[in-house]
Structures are given as C-alpha cells and as structure tokens.
Amino acid sequence: LVAANDLQGDDCFVLIRKVLVPIFLLSSAILGFPAVTEAQENPYFVAYDHYLEEPGNLEVEYLSTFGTERGGNDFHSYWTEFEYGATAWWTTEFYLDGQTTFSDSTVLTGIRWENRFRPLRREHFINPILYVEYEHKNAADKILKEVEGHDVEADFLTPNAVARREMSNEVELKLILSGVHKGWNFTENTLAAKNLANSPWEFGYALAASRPLALEASAKQCSFCRQNFIAGLEMYGGLGDRHRFGFGDTSHYLAPVLGWNLPSGWMLRVSPGFGLNDNSHRFLLRWGLSREITGFGPMVSRLFRGRP
C-alpha cells in the first residue's frame, strides 16, 4: 500500500499504469454490461438487511464519505465493492479501500473480504443473517463502514505518513436480524470485531428502517415514479470492548438515507450523517453509485467454455 504524495516522477506513472488504470478499466467494463433487473435495494451505508445477491448476479458499487475533523484536516474516503451471489444462501464480496486527507496525502488503505450466510431458507417475520469479514488494512483507514469499540474522531488526527505504516488483520462478525412489515424494512446488526494481534474483542451496533415512497408499481416504466425512491434512517456506533463494554468513550451517528433505483439497473444513494456526541465527527456526507449485472456468473462460465 502506497501514499500518492510519496510518489515522484516515473514512480507515479508506474502506479497509474499498473494499478489505477486497470482498476478503472475493469470497473468501466463491468458497469457497461447490460443490466435487466427490477430488484429494489435498501439505501443503507452501514446497516445490512436480510436480502442476499441473487445467485449468479454481480453488483459493482462505488461509495464515498466526506467527513469533517475538528483539530485536523477534513477527509474524503472511498471504496469499491464487488458483490457476487454465490448461492441462494451465500453472498461474497470484495472491497478495495482508500482515502484522501486534505492538505495531507492520498492513501490506499486496505482490502476486505466479506461473506454473508442465510441459515433459513424461507422468509420469516425476523430473518437472521450470519456475517463474516476479513480485513487487511492500515491505521489510515477512514471509510467508517462501521463503528466499533472505542473508535472516536480523534483517532483520525494521525498523519497519513505515520498511520499507513501500522498494519492490522481483523476478523469481524455480525448477527443481522431483519424483516419487512407493511412495506417497512427494519434491521438490527450486532457487531464483534477482533484484531488478530493481541487485542480484545470490540463491539458495535447498527439500527435502520426504510420504506419505498410508494408500494404499488406504476403501470408504465419510469425513472421518477415514487416507488423507485426508498427513504429511511440509520443509527450506528460503538459499544466498547471486552474490558470496558458500554457507551463510555464511544462515538455514535444518526443519518437519514435516500436511495433511487433506476429501471436501467443503476442505483444512486445519499446520506448526510450527524455525530451524536463529542467523540463523533460532527458531519459525514455519504454517496454511492451501483449497478447490478444479471447472470454474470453463467455469462463468464460460457466465455471460458467457449460457448456463445
């Protein structure tokens, strides 16, 4: 992992040619595939519901977070997700993370491999999902995909040149409990994370609810119909660690969320978030763009077998 500000001359061109350009071309090619899907996605950025990716489908997503930093420099973090429906009960996902701290530098911060499993085949009033994630990242990570333990705003004051040298390997577990009632989705996520070095288990939570602006679909296909928009709210924060469990020295956020599902298969989402105590960033602005590709797995399989 390298910091862009540390690169000079030919090294910068090597990075662009060998790393950034291939990632951009791969994402552009995938996003250019036709998508034929009417699935509605919830607009959450932190919380998860009980829906998995359809088997054989691939979703490509770009997400960003702008955050304010008291006593330091504001930042813009970003990550790309590749989510694949392996089976009807298993969805797997790969992340590539980075961030830019203003008046500091740009850093690639790590990779993540996420897996979600659905133990119950049929829909229930409450649907459990088991979540397992492996993270290889450095201390400059600022994507705030979750808040755990005693994570606070002051942790982000360390300069990138120092923070990126501190590497960690973590395992993250979640129990997701989600259901739908009268068009509303309600979900609760309980988090436990462990740095594989000699560190205690850390805990966190996320709560969310959302609903389409209209439950009945329009008779004609349209982009601005009310049923294409989903609005909601999510709240998330840390719960301390094994030695000091609870709300002491933790940060918490409340964020309205809005998603726009387009008939073409694209989804746009946005969420302004607000810190609820002095340990939290005062303001977070998140936005994202995603595209689902139906039948990606079978299509790739046919390509390798030489069939049309």
Where are these regions (language model features)?
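Low-complexity, intrinsically disordered short segments enriched for Gly/Pro and polybasic residues
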Residues: 1, 28, 42-43
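Extreme N-terminal basic, low-complexity initiation segments
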Residues: 2-8
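Bacterial N-terminal signal peptides that target proteins for export
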Residues: 8-24
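Bacterial N-terminal signal peptides
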Residues: 22-32
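Sec/Tat signal peptide C-region and signal peptidase I cleavage site
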Residues: 33-39
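Transmembrane beta-barrel domains of Gram-negative outer membranes and organellar outer membranes
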Residues: 39-308
